[in-house]
Amino acid sequence: MNSIPKQSARYVPIFAAVLAIFFIVLSPVQAQCPIPDIAHTSLLEANQPGMEITTAQLVDFLAQRTPPVLDVRFPQEYAISHIPGAINIPPDSTADPNNVQHESGEIAARYPADAPLVLTCNGPSCGKSKRVAKALHDNYGFTNVLRYQLGLPVWRALGNTVQTDLDGFAYIFNRDFTAVFVDARAPEAFRADTVACAVNVQKDEADAANTDGRLPLLDKGARVVVFADNPQMAKIVAAQIAKKAYWSSSYFSGNFEDLENSREMRIHSERRCHVSEAQHTEPEHDDD
C-alpha cells in the first residue's frame, strides 16, 4: 500500500487550516451578497443607455403609480396586451421603425428632463426602449431614464397578467379562433347572455377550470381573455389563470356592456366557435 510521504504529510494540517479559514471568511460574504431570485434581477447589460430595473422594482413602481411606465410599442400591440398601468407612447407609423424622434419628442413634451421614467417594450430582444432612452438623453437632456428591458414576455413568464383594451379584444375575437374567452361574471348573468363560446370561470375556480375542460390544458400558449362587469374582477380571475401557466392570458379593461356595444365585432356570432371546434377536433382514423 502506498503511503503519503512524510514531507507531504506535514502540509496536510496546514492546508486543512487554510481551507477552514477560507470558508470562515467566505461565509459572511455569501450572506451579505445572496444570489437574487428571478424577480430581483435583470439582463445586467453593460454600457447601455438608461439603467435597467427588475420585475420586483417595476411592481413597486406600478403600485405607487410613480415613476410613469411608458410602453413604446405600436398602438395595436399595446391594445392587444400591455402591462397594467403602462402608458402607450406610440411611434409614428409612417416613419422608419429605427427612428424614435416621434416617441422621444412626445415624452419630452410631457415630462421634465429631470423626472424619472421607465421605458419598456417587447422584451430582451427589443431595442426600442434603448433607442428611445438614448434619444432622450442625447437630444433632450434626460438624466433619469430607467428601462424594464425584460419587457412584456418576461413579465408574463413570471406569472403576471396583462391588460387587453377594446380594440385588442376585437382583434383577438375576429382573428384568433383558438382564443378562449372567459366570462367571470355570476353564473346567472353568464347564462342570460355572454360572448359566443365563452366559458364561465369564477374567482378561485382556476384550478378546477384547468382540468375540467373550461381552459385549454394542453395548449398553455393559447390566448385566454377574461372579461366581467368589473375590470378589477376580471383582473383577479386573469391573474389566477396566469398562475396556472397560461402565459398568454389577459383581462379586458372594460365591461360586458362595452363588448355588446362595440361596432368592431359581433360578440354573439358563433362562426368562430365552429372554426375553433374544428381546429381542436382530432381526425378520425380507420380501424384497418
Each predicted region: which residue ranges?
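Bacterial N-terminal signal peptides that target proteins for export
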Residues: 2-15
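Rhodanese-like catalytic fold shared by cysteine-dependent sulfurtransferases
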Residues: 6, 23-52, 79-116, 123-180, ...
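Alpha-helical protein-protein interaction elements
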Residues: 14-15, 70, 103, 147
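Bacterial N-terminal signal peptides
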Residues: 14-25
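Mature N-terminal segment immediately following signal peptide/propeptide cleavage
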Residues: 52-62, 68, 72-75
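Short, charged low-complexity linear motifs
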Residues: 63-64, 141
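Short loop/turn hinge sites at secondary-structure boundaries
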Residues: 64-65, 176
